[in-house]
Amino acid sequence: MENISRRTFLKSGAAAAAAAAFPLSAEAAAPAGTAAVSALCPTQYGPVQGKAQGSHLVWYGIPYAAAPVGDARWRAPQEPTGWTNPLDCTAPAPAAYQVSSAPIGTEDCLRLDVYSVPSAHSRPVLVYLHGGNNQTGDSLELPGGDLVENDGCVFVSLNYRLGLFGFNSLPALCPEDGGTGNFALLDIAKALDWVRENISAFGGDPANITLSGFSAGGRNVMACLTSPLFAGRFQKAISFSGGITFSDPDAAARQIAAALAPLAVEDGRFADENAAFAGLLTPDAAVREWLCSVEPSRIASRMPHAALRMSVFPHLYADDVVLPKAGFAAGTLHQVPLLLLTGSTEFSAFALYDGWFASE
Protein backbone atom coordinates (compact mmCIF):
# COMPACT_ATOMS: atom_id res chain seq x y z
CA MET A 1 0.00 0.00 0.00
CA GLU A 2 1.92 2.99 -1.26
CA ASN A 3 1.75 6.50 0.15
CA ILE A 4 -0.29 5.46 3.15
CA SER A 5 0.87 5.61 6.74
CA ARG A 6 1.01 2.61 9.05
CA ARG A 7 -1.67 4.11 11.29
CA THR A 8 -3.94 4.96 8.33
CA PHE A 9 -3.64 1.38 7.11
CA LEU A 10 -4.43 0.07 10.57
CA LYS A 11 -7.43 2.34 11.03
CA SER A 12 -8.80 1.53 7.58
CA GLY A 13 -8.24 -2.18 8.03
CA ALA A 14 -9.68 -2.20 11.53
CA ALA A 15 -12.78 -0.32 10.40
CA ALA A 16 -13.30 -2.72 7.49
CA ALA A 17 -12.76 -5.72 9.74
CA ALA A 18 -15.11 -4.36 12.38
CA ALA A 19 -17.79 -3.68 9.80
CA ALA A 20 -17.55 -7.29 8.65
CA ALA A 21 -17.22 -8.91 12.06
CA PHE A 22 -19.40 -6.62 14.18
CA PRO A 23 -22.48 -5.40 12.32
CA LEU A 24 -24.21 -2.65 14.25
CA SER A 25 -27.20 -4.92 14.68
CA ALA A 26 -25.02 -7.20 16.82
CA GLU A 27 -25.43 -5.00 19.88
CA ALA A 28 -28.23 -6.28 22.08
CA ALA A 29 -30.75 -3.81 23.37
CA ALA A 30 -30.07 -2.88 26.97
CA PRO A 31 -32.80 -4.00 29.38
CA ALA A 32 -34.90 -1.22 30.81
CA GLY A 33 -33.19 0.42 33.75
CA THR A 34 -29.68 -0.64 32.72
CA ALA A 35 -27.18 1.97 33.88
CA ALA A 36 -24.98 3.68 31.31
CA VAL A 37 -21.29 2.81 31.24
CA SER A 38 -19.52 5.32 33.48
CA ALA A 39 -15.97 6.66 33.42
CA LEU A 40 -15.73 5.23 36.96
CA CYS A 41 -16.02 1.52 36.28
CA PRO A 42 -15.73 -1.55 38.53
CA THR A 43 -13.34 -4.45 37.91
CA GLN A 44 -12.72 -7.60 39.94
CA TYR A 45 -9.57 -6.00 41.40
CA GLY A 46 -10.96 -2.55 42.16
CA PRO A 47 -12.58 0.50 40.52
CA VAL A 48 -10.87 2.28 37.62
CA GLN A 49 -11.31 5.94 36.72
CA GLY A 50 -11.25 6.68 32.99
CA LYS A 51 -12.23 9.78 31.08
CA ALA A 52 -14.44 10.99 28.26
CA GLN A 53 -12.84 11.76 24.90
CA GLY A 54 -15.40 13.23 22.55
CA SER A 55 -18.28 10.76 22.40
CA HIS A 56 -16.40 7.81 23.86
CA LEU A 57 -14.79 6.75 27.12
CA VAL A 58 -11.25 5.47 27.57
CA TRP A 59 -9.38 3.80 30.43
CA TYR A 60 -5.60 3.61 30.04
CA GLY A 61 -3.22 1.22 31.75
CA ILE A 62 -5.58 -1.05 33.68
CA PRO A 63 -3.47 -3.80 35.32
CA TYR A 64 -4.43 -7.29 34.16
CA ALA A 65 -1.55 -8.97 36.01
CA ALA A 66 1.08 -8.19 38.61
CA ALA A 67 4.33 -6.52 37.56
CA PRO A 68 6.74 -9.21 36.21
CA VAL A 69 9.76 -7.91 38.10
CA GLY A 70 12.44 -9.46 40.28
CA ASP A 71 12.00 -13.21 40.51
CA ALA A 72 8.78 -12.89 38.48
CA ARG A 73 10.67 -11.51 35.46
CA TRP A 74 10.42 -14.83 33.58
CA ARG A 75 7.40 -16.46 35.15
CA ALA A 76 3.78 -16.83 34.14
CA PRO A 77 1.76 -13.67 34.90
CA GLN A 78 0.19 -13.56 38.35
CA GLU A 79 -2.92 -11.89 39.73
CA PRO A 80 -2.47 -8.17 40.46
CA THR A 81 -2.90 -6.90 43.99
CA GLY A 82 -6.37 -5.43 44.40
CA TRP A 83 -7.14 -1.85 45.35
CA THR A 84 -10.02 -0.04 47.05
CA ASN A 85 -9.82 3.58 45.91
CA PRO A 86 -10.39 4.37 42.22
CA LEU A 87 -7.26 3.75 40.15
CA ASP A 88 -6.40 6.71 37.92
CA CYS A 89 -6.52 5.43 34.33
CA THR A 90 -6.83 8.79 32.58
CA ALA A 91 -3.31 8.96 31.08
CA PRO A 92 -1.49 6.45 28.85
CA ALA A 93 0.67 3.93 30.67
CA PRO A 94 4.34 3.42 29.74
CA ALA A 95 5.17 0.86 27.08
CA ALA A 96 6.72 -2.50 27.89
CA TYR A 97 10.48 -2.24 28.34
CA GLN A 98 12.18 -2.05 24.94
CA VAL A 99 15.14 -0.58 23.10
CA SER A 100 14.63 1.44 19.95
CA SER A 101 16.91 4.44 19.54
CA ALA A 102 17.14 4.41 23.35
CA PRO A 103 15.68 2.33 26.18
CA ILE A 104 12.07 3.22 27.00
CA GLY A 105 9.21 1.75 28.97
CA THR A 106 8.94 -0.32 32.11
CA GLU A 107 8.86 -3.94 33.17
CA ASP A 108 5.63 -3.12 35.03
CA CYS A 109 3.85 -3.38 31.69
CA LEU A 110 1.03 -5.91 32.00
CA ARG A 111 -1.70 -3.36 31.45
CA LEU A 112 -4.43 -2.75 28.91
CA ASP A 113 -6.54 0.09 27.54
CA VAL A 114 -10.32 -0.09 27.12
CA TYR A 115 -12.45 2.09 24.83
CA SER A 116 -16.25 2.12 25.05
CA VAL A 117 -19.26 4.44 24.88
CA PRO A 118 -21.80 5.26 27.61
CA SER A 119 -24.60 3.45 25.77
CA ALA A 120 -22.65 0.20 25.24
CA HIS A 121 -24.36 -3.03 26.28
CA SER A 122 -23.25 -6.55 25.36
CA ARG A 123 -21.21 -5.26 22.43
CA PRO A 124 -18.75 -7.49 20.58
CA VAL A 125 -15.22 -7.03 21.93
CA LEU A 126 -12.17 -6.41 19.72
CA VAL A 127 -8.85 -7.19 21.46
CA TYR A 128 -5.79 -5.79 19.65
CA LEU A 129 -2.13 -6.89 19.74
CA HIS A 130 0.33 -4.26 18.48
CA GLY A 131 3.14 -4.83 15.97
CA GLY A 132 6.88 -4.25 16.29
CA ASN A 133 8.75 -7.57 15.85
CA ASN A 134 7.67 -8.59 19.36
CA GLN A 135 10.48 -6.26 20.43
CA THR A 136 8.95 -2.78 20.20
CA GLY A 137 5.53 -1.09 20.18
CA ASP A 138 2.73 -0.41 22.62
CA SER A 139 -1.01 -0.37 23.16
CA LEU A 140 -1.39 3.12 21.66
CA GLU A 141 -0.56 1.91 18.14
CA LEU A 142 -4.24 1.78 17.19
CA PRO A 143 -6.50 4.12 19.20
CA GLY A 144 -9.97 2.66 19.51
CA GLY A 145 -12.14 5.78 19.74
CA ASP A 146 -13.36 5.76 16.13
CA LEU A 147 -14.11 2.03 16.29
CA VAL A 148 -16.29 2.21 19.38
CA GLU A 149 -18.09 5.34 18.15
CA ASN A 150 -18.78 4.06 14.63
CA ASP A 151 -18.53 0.27 14.54
CA GLY A 152 -20.48 -1.02 17.51
CA CYS A 153 -17.73 -2.72 19.52
CA VAL A 154 -15.78 -2.34 22.74
CA PHE A 155 -12.05 -2.08 21.99
CA VAL A 156 -9.18 -3.40 24.13
CA SER A 157 -5.48 -2.88 23.36
CA LEU A 158 -2.77 -4.35 25.53
CA ASN A 159 0.88 -4.24 26.41
CA TYR A 160 2.78 -7.48 27.00
CA ARG A 161 6.39 -8.42 27.59
CA LEU A 162 8.70 -7.83 24.62
CA GLY A 163 12.11 -8.95 23.44
CA LEU A 164 14.03 -11.29 25.71
CA PHE A 165 11.58 -10.51 28.51
CA GLY A 166 8.71 -11.88 26.43
CA PHE A 167 10.52 -14.77 24.76
CA ASN A 168 13.44 -16.57 26.40
CA SER A 169 14.05 -20.31 26.19
CA LEU A 170 17.13 -20.65 28.41
CA PRO A 171 16.77 -23.88 30.46
CA ALA A 172 17.07 -22.08 33.80
CA LEU A 173 13.95 -20.07 32.90
CA CYS A 174 11.99 -22.97 31.41
CA PRO A 175 12.10 -25.97 33.74
CA GLU A 176 11.38 -29.30 32.14
CA ASP A 177 8.19 -29.79 34.18
CA GLY A 178 6.01 -28.02 31.64
CA GLY A 179 7.81 -24.68 31.55
CA THR A 180 7.79 -22.49 28.46
CA GLY A 181 9.76 -19.53 27.19
CA ASN A 182 6.72 -18.03 25.46
CA PHE A 183 6.07 -15.52 28.24
CA ALA A 184 4.42 -12.95 25.96
CA LEU A 185 1.82 -15.52 24.92
CA LEU A 186 1.14 -16.28 28.58
CA ASP A 187 0.58 -12.53 29.04
CA ILE A 188 -1.90 -12.45 26.16
CA ALA A 189 -3.79 -15.41 27.62
CA LYS A 190 -3.94 -13.65 30.99
CA ALA A 191 -5.23 -10.47 29.36
CA LEU A 192 -7.96 -12.43 27.58
CA ASP A 193 -8.98 -13.89 30.95
CA TRP A 194 -9.24 -10.34 32.31
CA VAL A 195 -11.42 -9.35 29.37
CA ARG A 196 -13.70 -12.32 29.84
CA GLU A 197 -14.08 -11.60 33.56
CA ASN A 198 -14.44 -7.81 33.47
CA ILE A 199 -15.53 -6.50 30.08
CA SER A 200 -19.27 -6.66 30.78
CA ALA A 201 -18.85 -3.67 33.14
CA PHE A 202 -17.54 -1.70 30.14
CA GLY A 203 -20.48 -2.69 27.93
CA GLY A 204 -18.82 -5.66 26.23
CA ASP A 205 -19.98 -9.23 25.67
CA PRO A 206 -17.50 -11.69 27.27
CA ALA A 207 -18.82 -14.45 25.01
CA ASN A 208 -18.04 -12.52 21.81
CA ILE A 209 -14.31 -11.72 21.81
CA THR A 210 -12.31 -11.23 18.62
CA LEU A 211 -8.52 -11.44 18.94
CA SER A 212 -6.74 -9.24 16.39
CA GLY A 213 -3.22 -7.99 15.75
CA PHE A 214 -0.95 -6.25 13.27
CA SER A 215 2.40 -7.52 11.93
CA ALA A 216 4.05 -9.26 14.90
CA GLY A 217 0.71 -8.93 16.66
CA GLY A 218 -0.88 -10.68 13.68
CA ARG A 219 1.68 -13.47 13.97
CA ASN A 220 0.83 -13.76 17.64
CA VAL A 221 -2.84 -14.13 16.69
CA MET A 222 -1.93 -16.96 14.31
CA ALA A 223 0.16 -18.57 17.05
CA CYS A 224 -2.77 -18.34 19.47
CA LEU A 225 -4.94 -20.11 16.90
CA THR A 226 -2.66 -23.16 17.11
CA SER A 227 -2.12 -23.15 20.87
CA PRO A 228 -4.15 -25.41 23.17
CA LEU A 229 -3.66 -22.75 25.85
CA PHE A 230 -6.09 -20.45 24.01
CA ALA A 231 -8.98 -22.87 23.59
CA GLY A 232 -12.19 -21.01 24.44
CA ARG A 233 -10.43 -17.73 25.16
CA PHE A 234 -11.70 -15.99 22.00
CA GLN A 235 -14.43 -16.62 19.44
CA LYS A 236 -13.08 -14.94 16.28
CA ALA A 237 -9.68 -13.82 14.96
CA ILE A 238 -8.31 -11.11 12.66
CA SER A 239 -4.69 -11.01 11.49
CA PHE A 240 -3.42 -7.80 9.87
CA SER A 241 -0.21 -8.52 7.92
CA GLY A 242 0.48 -11.57 10.05
CA GLY A 243 1.97 -14.92 9.13
CA ILE A 244 3.05 -17.97 11.01
CA THR A 245 6.67 -18.67 11.90
CA PHE A 246 7.71 -20.74 14.89
CA SER A 247 11.26 -21.29 16.14
CA ASP A 248 13.15 -24.16 17.76
CA PRO A 249 13.48 -23.42 21.50
CA ASP A 250 16.78 -25.31 21.81
CA ALA A 251 18.41 -23.48 18.91
CA ALA A 252 17.02 -20.22 20.28
CA ALA A 253 18.50 -20.97 23.71
CA ARG A 254 21.95 -21.36 22.15
CA GLN A 255 21.58 -18.04 20.36
CA ILE A 256 20.39 -16.31 23.53
CA ALA A 257 23.22 -17.83 25.57
CA ALA A 258 25.75 -16.51 23.06
CA ALA A 259 24.19 -13.05 23.24
CA LEU A 260 24.14 -12.92 27.05
CA ALA A 261 27.51 -14.58 27.68
CA PRO A 262 29.47 -11.28 27.59
CA LEU A 263 27.24 -9.91 30.36
CA ALA A 264 27.90 -12.96 32.52
CA VAL A 265 31.64 -12.46 32.09
CA GLU A 266 31.35 -8.73 32.86
CA ASP A 267 29.57 -9.60 36.11
CA GLY A 268 32.19 -12.15 37.12
CA ARG A 269 29.88 -15.15 36.85
CA PHE A 270 32.19 -17.03 34.48
CA ALA A 271 35.86 -16.76 33.53
CA ASP A 272 35.31 -16.40 29.79
CA GLU A 273 32.57 -16.39 27.17
CA ASN A 274 32.94 -20.08 26.33
CA ALA A 275 32.35 -21.01 29.94
CA ALA A 276 29.50 -18.51 30.15
CA PHE A 277 27.87 -19.94 27.03
CA ALA A 278 27.98 -23.45 28.46
CA GLY A 279 26.81 -22.33 31.89
CA LEU A 280 23.86 -20.37 30.55
CA LEU A 281 22.60 -23.51 28.83
CA THR A 282 22.21 -25.35 32.14
CA PRO A 283 19.12 -25.36 34.40
CA ASP A 284 21.23 -24.05 37.29
CA ALA A 285 19.10 -21.93 39.64
CA ALA A 286 22.04 -19.54 40.01
CA VAL A 287 21.68 -18.64 36.33
CA ARG A 288 18.08 -17.64 36.89
CA GLU A 289 18.96 -15.69 40.03
CA TRP A 290 21.64 -13.74 38.16
CA LEU A 291 19.46 -13.03 35.12
CA CYS A 292 16.66 -11.69 37.30
CA SER A 293 19.11 -9.25 38.88
CA VAL A 294 20.53 -7.80 35.65
CA GLU A 295 19.45 -4.29 34.67
CA PRO A 296 16.81 -4.52 31.91
CA SER A 297 18.70 -2.19 29.56
CA ARG A 298 21.66 -4.58 29.47
CA ILE A 299 19.44 -7.51 28.52
CA ALA A 300 17.24 -5.72 25.99
CA SER A 301 20.23 -4.35 24.08
CA ARG A 302 21.74 -7.78 23.41
CA MET A 303 19.34 -8.89 20.63
CA PRO A 304 17.93 -5.77 18.95
CA HIS A 305 16.08 -5.36 15.66
CA ALA A 306 14.55 -8.67 14.59
CA ALA A 307 15.03 -9.75 10.99
CA LEU A 308 13.25 -12.02 8.55
CA ARG A 309 12.92 -15.68 9.53
CA MET A 310 13.77 -14.68 13.10
CA SER A 311 17.49 -14.89 12.35
CA VAL A 312 18.36 -12.24 14.95
CA PHE A 313 15.68 -12.73 17.59
CA PRO A 314 14.10 -16.22 17.46
CA HIS A 315 10.78 -16.37 19.29
CA LEU A 316 7.35 -18.05 19.25
CA TYR A 317 8.88 -21.32 20.41
CA ALA A 318 7.41 -24.58 19.16
CA ASP A 319 7.97 -26.22 22.53
CA ASP A 320 4.93 -28.54 22.67
CA VAL A 321 3.90 -26.66 25.80
CA VAL A 322 2.28 -23.49 24.49
CA LEU A 323 2.88 -24.01 20.75
CA PRO A 324 2.89 -27.39 18.97
CA LYS A 325 6.19 -28.46 17.44
CA ALA A 326 4.38 -29.36 14.23
CA GLY A 327 2.77 -25.93 13.86
CA PHE A 328 -0.39 -25.93 11.75
CA ALA A 329 0.32 -29.54 10.77
CA ALA A 330 -0.46 -30.56 14.35
CA GLY A 331 -4.14 -30.13 13.57
CA THR A 332 -4.81 -28.10 16.71
CA LEU A 333 -6.07 -24.99 14.91
CA HIS A 334 -9.04 -23.56 16.79
CA GLN A 335 -12.17 -23.64 14.67
CA VAL A 336 -13.11 -19.97 14.85
CA PRO A 337 -13.83 -17.51 12.02
CA LEU A 338 -10.57 -15.97 10.78
CA LEU A 339 -10.18 -12.78 8.71
CA LEU A 340 -6.80 -12.13 7.04
CA LEU A 341 -5.81 -8.63 5.88
CA THR A 342 -2.68 -7.53 4.03
CA GLY A 343 -1.19 -4.54 2.18
CA SER A 344 -0.15 -4.93 -1.45
CA THR A 345 3.44 -3.67 -1.00
CA GLU A 346 3.98 -4.13 2.73
CA PHE A 347 6.86 -6.60 2.21
CA SER A 348 8.83 -4.45 -0.23
CA ALA A 349 11.10 -2.78 2.33
CA PHE A 350 12.04 -6.14 3.88
CA ALA A 351 12.81 -7.68 0.49
CA LEU A 352 15.36 -4.95 -0.28
CA TYR A 353 17.63 -6.27 2.47
CA ASP A 354 17.10 -10.00 2.10
CA GLY A 355 19.32 -12.13 -0.12
CA TRP A 356 16.51 -14.49 -1.01
CA PHE A 357 14.79 -11.79 -3.05
CA ALA A 358 16.47 -10.54 -6.23
CA SER A 359 15.70 -7.05 -7.52
CA GLU A 360 14.66 -6.73 -11.14
Positions of the model-derived regions?
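Short glycine-enriched nucleophile-adjacent loop
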Residues: G218-L229
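Gly/Ala-rich beta-loop-alpha elbow adjacent to hydrolase catalytic centers
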Residues: G213, G217
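Alpha/beta-hydrolase-fold catalytic nucleophile elbow
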Residues: N159, S212, I238-S241, T342
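Non-catalytic accessory segments of hydrolases
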Residues: L10-G13, A28-N182, P206, S344-F347
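Alpha/beta-hydrolase fold nucleophile elbow
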Residues: G204-S212
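N-terminal export signals
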Residues: E2, T8-A29
